[in-house]
Regions:
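Hydrophobic pocket-lining residues within nucleotide cofactor-binding pockets
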Residues: 141
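Non-catalytic helical tethers at domain boundaries
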Residues: 1-138
Length: 141
């Protein structure tokens, strides 16, 4: 499928959703029980997942899928937001911004699957948000 005709729309909408994620994560950091914020983050991740999947950006789709899973658990009351989770979510935001930057420059998301971040998200689900997981830290340059 030739997606070039949709690329500009994808980039514009991705930037809007990334800005929403950024704004809402800042609120979530201060108000971890804010259900409106939790719902906004879920919707932004869900929208990014769908758009990435449609465009064939599987790495971006996988990361946003796991973010969506975390927020589904939070929304259902199965886990609580804590500072460790917020830190990982900011790492997700950075990774998503990198994917979008790569797509803007090369029409390709790149080769980084962000496996350590995905593992951290899944560890939160497994520990029911109790923070009993190792956080991903970026390697030093």
């Amino acid at each position: 499928m030739d997606v070039s005709q949709y690329l500009e729309i994808f980039l514009d909408e991705s930037n809007e959703h990334l800005q929403t994620l950024s704004d809402q994560l800042i609120i979530l950091e201060k108000e971890p029980d804010n259900s409106d914020t939790i719902n906004e983050i879920f919707r932004a991740a869900h929208s990014l997942k769908g758009m990435a999947g449609t465009m064939g950006y599987k790495r971006m789709q996988n990361l946003t899928h796991d973010m969506e899973n975390v927020f589904s658990e939070v929304r259902n009351g199965n886990m609580e937001v804590n500072s460790n989770l917020v830190d990982v979510l900011f790492q997700c935001l950075d990774a998503l911004e990198t994917y979008v930057d790569n797509i803007r420059e090369t029409q390709d998301e790149g080769t980084d699957d962000n496996e350590p971040i995905i593992k951290a998200l899944n560890a939160f689900i497994a520990s029911e948000g109790k923070g009993n997981c190792l956080l991903y830290t970026s390697p030093s340059p």
